[in-house]
Amino acid sequence: MHGFRYFDGRAIIGFVDGTENPEPVIAAQWALVGNEDPDFIGGSYAFIQKYTHDMEKWRALSDDEQEKVIGRKKFNDIELDDEEKPLTAHNVVSKAHDAEGNELKIMRANMPFSNPSKNEYGTFFIGYSRKFSTTRQMLENMFLGNEQGNLDRLLDFSTAQTGTLFFVPTVDFLDGLGDE
C-alpha cells in the first residue's frame, strides 16, 4: 500500500481534501495545545484513521450526486449553497461546535492510498487538534448522527478500517523527560 499526493490535493474520490482547514496564520490555535494544559503546551492530538472506499459504488454516482454527498463542487471546489446541500452532506455533518455554536476546527493532512493488486483504495484521515474532544465530536456526528440526527452520507461509500489516537509532544517536552 502506498500513500501519495493526488493532483491538486484531491482525495482518491476526486474532491479536494482539507478545504475546511483553518488558514495557516491561525492553524496553531486549532492544532496545538495551549495554556489550558501547561504541561503539554505546544503538543497536538493526532488521530489517524484508515478509510477504504467502495470505488465501484462511488463511480456509479453522477458528479451531481457525488457533490451532494460531499457538499462541494467536484471540479472547482466551491461549497454548495445551503438550499441545494443535503443535511447529510459530509461538510455539514462532520463539523464540530462549542457550547455557543461556534465552529471548532482541526488541521487535516489526509493522504490518499491505493493497493491496486488488492483492489483497495482509500484515505488515511490524519487530524491534528488542540483538544481531542473536537475530533471526537466530528466523528460522533459522522457515525452516530449530529444534533439533528443526520449521519454522514460519505460513510455509505467509505468504511473506517482502523483508528488510533496519538499525543505528539514538543521536542522540549521530550528533552525534559530525561531531567526528571
Residue ranges and their predicted role:
Residues 1-180:
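Long, histidine/aromatic-enriched segments associated with O2/redox biology
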